[in-house]
Amino acid sequence: EYLQHLEAVLSVLQQHQFFANHSKCSFGQSQIQYLGHMILEEGVAVDPIKVQYMLQWPQPKTISGLRGFLGLTGYYRRFIRDYGKKAKPLTDLLKKGNFSWPEAATTAFETLKLAMTTTPVLALPDFNQPFIIECDASGTWIGAVLSQNKHPIAFFSK
C-alpha cells in the first residue's frame, strides 16, 4: 500500500512537471524532521533540538532579543495551551516606552521555556471522526483546544 501511494504521488508530480530531488527525499521513514517539527506516526511534535535551543535562550536584555524569543516560541504556539495568556507579560513589554524587565516578565519567560519542554504530540486530524472544540475566555485573552478522541490537534490563544 505504501509503494502504491508513493507511486501515485510521484506520478502526479511528474504529470505536472515537478521533480523530487532524490538527495532531499526520505522514503519509508517512521518519523522525519521537517521545518522545526517531528512528523511521527502518532502526530506532530516539536523538534527536540529547537526545545534545547529555547532552554538555553538567555533572558532578553533588549526589545529585539525579546522579539526573537517570542518569535521562536510563537512559531510553536499551537503546541502550548494558553500561549497568549502565558506570553502576555512579555508581549506587553513590546509596547512603546522604556524597556524594563519586571518580575512578571521573568515568570512568563520561565513559564514559556518550561511549557516548551512539556509540549504534547499533536494528533493528526481524522476527518471521518467528530472534532471537539473547548473554549475559555476572559477580558484580556481567549484560548481554545481542538481535539479528537481526547487527543489535542492544536491549541489556539490570543
Enumerate the predicted regions with their spans:
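Retroelement reverse transcriptase polymerase core
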Residues: E1-K158
